[in-house]
Amino acid sequence: MGKQTASKRQSLHHKHKVLKKVAEHHRKVKRFAKQHPELNKSRKDPGIPNLWPFKEDMLNKIEQQKQKASEEKKNKKEKRRLEQMAEARRDIASMAADAKRRESEFQERQQLKQQQKQQGKFEKEGKDSSLKQFYREVKKVIEAGDVILQVLDARDPMGCRCLEIEKMILERYTNKKIVLILNKIDLVPRENVLMWLKYLRNFYPTLAFKCSTQQQKRNLGQQGGIQPELASNDMLNSTESLGAEQLLQLLKNYSRSLNIKTSVTVGIIGYPNVGKSSLINSLKRTRSVGVGATPGFTKFAQEVHLDKNVKLLDSPGIVPIKGNVDENIILRNVVKLEKVLDPIAPVDAILSRCSQKQILDIYEIAQYQSTTDFLTQVAAKRKKIVKGGIADLRSTAISVIRDWTGGKIPFYTQPPKVLVKSTLLSQFSDELNIDQSDLISTVSNQNTSFASLKYLEPKQQELDNSLFDDDDEEDEEEMEDEDEDDDEEEEEEMEDEEDEEDEEDEEDEDEMEEDSDSEALLKYQQQKQVVKATAKQVAQIKSKSQNLKDENDQFNPQSNKQLKKQNKKLKKKFGIVSTSSKQVQDDDDEDDDDEQEEIDQDDEDDEDIDEDEAF
């Protein structure tokens, strides 16, 4: 423990004693100042004496010095002020130049953004490796399939129908049959489904379908006994699939009409998120392939055996985009929303297509005046707020687009009024045995809970056929390279065999040179030629024997007599005979034994006759 400090407390006697001494000291100082005032008075400048002869000149000189000092001080002050003003002007000029430069940069950025908006609202992937891979997989499915099922979204069938793919199939693969599957019929009114079926059946056989939405892995439910387009609301709202029975019957009719004894291969193509994988799972009644709401979930072709007669091929989603991309492509859920640069523009398109009453009923918000006002209210309701209490409009817009593609905002499109008759339909209908009669003559369209969109001639996205052509060229180049590699391998194998034969011949010749003279070598070469000729003849006889219908002709001793002689010579010289030659030799030996037995029997008979004659 440290040493304690002394206390500062003191007695009152000592305290007052100190105060008295201090007061006494102050009195003494005041008394001394009064008694000696000259010591404390400051001396004044006496100035120039009056008796100084040049007093006036001296005063003028002093005055001039004062004026000069004041002028110098004033000049310094003015110079300092001018310097500050010049520096301020330089700062203003630099600031103006900097502002002008930043303004030009801002204008350039705005022009670049405007160009990007005109060219497309999202970062276009182009012909990258993944897109080429998707097209290769789609091409494999089209080439392998006997029947091509193009799955369409019932809400916008023409928007997700790829006419370029259909044209390519009809031109390149004339033996392929195209069938349209109108999926997701539970998301649109029944009248609209019937109208679209009536329109699409003017081009290809078309079936309505509803995929299963059950979550279990096996034993997915199926409903049958009724046409899907005529099903009740309870059947449409259930989780079981509709239309599987009609589709399977159509495929069986196709195989029966063309007398196909093997299994029918069915290729399934379509835009992303139209329900291709869900269609396969509904037909298989198990979760055979994975499904997801993100475009591009299926990346490779997948084969699923439905039964011994039907084989299904799943393919990646087709994105046949060659030109610019507008809001319609984004609203069809063809591209990933994370890559969309301006998701507010598609939301503006959604609000323009739907009535405000419908939007207010769905999102339960107050009336809005603009798209930004709508997104701000939805962001506040869904708590999409960023730092500073600002609404996150981008993420809110993406969520609204997902509501549109996911079915939370119901909508449907009207088919065109002008129907284009097609000559291909009758041909397909006869082979597939599908009834193409008109379902209804007139239908009503009075449903306010849906966003009804009038049909506009859609700007069909052009398919970049160069991807398929490049794939063909690459396949041909690969085939040529493989053929060249096979030829090179065969040539190398032939050269290796010849080298081995030459080495064996050299070894045999060396041995013969050591054991015999030149005459023996000549004889050996002659024998070698005979062996080669015999081997060739044996090979020819073996190939001919496979084509003979009569089994007895294969081992005819008369036709193989020359071969028998040659094999005997080989056996005497080398002690080896080939398997085919050995078989012929065995047959010939058996024939010789039979002949020898007959001769011996004849000799015995002759001896018996001679003995009889002797007796």
Curated annotation (Swiss-Prot):
Residues 467-518, 586-615 have a biased composition (Acidic residues). Residues 53-105, 473-556 form a coiled coil. Residues 135-321 form the CP-type G domain. Its main location: nucleus. Residues 525-540 have a biased composition (Low complexity). SUPFAM superfamilies: P-loop containing nucleoside triphosphate hydrolases. One of its GO terms (molecular function) is GTP binding. It holds the Pfam family MMR_HSR1. The keyword Ion transport does not apply. This is Guanine nucleotide-binding protein-like 3 homolog. It comes from Dictyostelium discoideum. The gene is gnl3.
